[in-house]
Structure formats: C-alpha cells, structure tokens
C-alpha cells in the first residue's frame, strides 16, 4: 500500500532535511498491527534524532515520530487481541510521522473511552516527563 511519510535523509540542525514522500508500506507481518495514523506527538527525542544527537541513531532515511494513535487497518495472521476499526495507541522509536505504520502487537494498547487521538498520542512522554520531574527531580 502506498503511504505518505516524512523522511529525514541526513543529519541536520533543523528540519530542512525532511521531505514528504510516498513509499510502499508492506502488509503487516504475522504478529504486527497496521495502524492508520490519526495523531502523532512531536517530542524532544524526534528533534535530537534529526540532529544526530540522540543515543539511538536510526538508519537513514527515517521518519521521525515515536508516539502515535490511530485506527487498526489490518492485522497479521497471529494477532488475536485487535481487529480492524479498533482505536489504539503505540510507541515506536521512529516512524510515526506517516499515514500508516506496522508495529508489533505487544506494543499496541487500546485508547480508553472517548480520549481523543491527539491526547492519546501525546500521553506517554508527557506523563513520564511530569512524573520524573515531580518524583525524582522535585525531591
């Protein structure tokens, strides 16, 4: 399936090295969930990866974006917990600034109740940052 994604082709101090491109996304592997991305958080590690300053160095080219929320569009043959149409959230090292992604089913969680896609996508890093600030740094 053809999707649009933002690809970083080289290390850069700004986002000048990022282009919107069309790529081929494979069908999900047997234990993967394919998610139509509805929201993707922008976090400090995304910028650090683009600048080549993050401890993890993704292979070039790569799409930034580590936290995303969306709708399950397909599942691998061994996935039993999710079905197409489910509202879900996941965390990835990179790849989220895309129209769709494939990710391991064990990294996917249901979005509770009527929580918006935007809030679900930004919850993890924001929560952990606040928690560490209050419990580790604030004491």
Feature locations, PLM:
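Conserved hydrophobic/aromatic beta-strand scaffold that supports enzyme active sites
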Residues: 20-25, 69-71, 100-102, 108
């Amino acid at each position: 399936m053809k999707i649009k994604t933002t690809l970083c082709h080289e290390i850069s101090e700004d986002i000048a090295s990022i282009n919107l491109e069309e790529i081929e996304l494979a069908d999900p592997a047997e234990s993967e969930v394919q998610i139509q991305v509805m929201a993707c958080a922008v976090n400090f590690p995304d910028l650090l990866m683009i600048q080549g300053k993050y401890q993890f160095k993704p292979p070039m080219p790569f799409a930034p974006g580590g936290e995303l929320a969306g709708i399950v569009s397909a599942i691998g043959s061994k996935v039993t917990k999710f079905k197409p149409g489910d509202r879900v959230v996941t965390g990835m090292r990179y790849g989220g600034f895309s129209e769709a992604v494939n990710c391991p089913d064990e990294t996917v969680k249901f979005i509770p109740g009527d929580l918006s896609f935007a809030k679900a996508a930004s919850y993890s890093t924001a929560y952990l940052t606040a928690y560490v600030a209050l419990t580790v740094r604030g004491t």
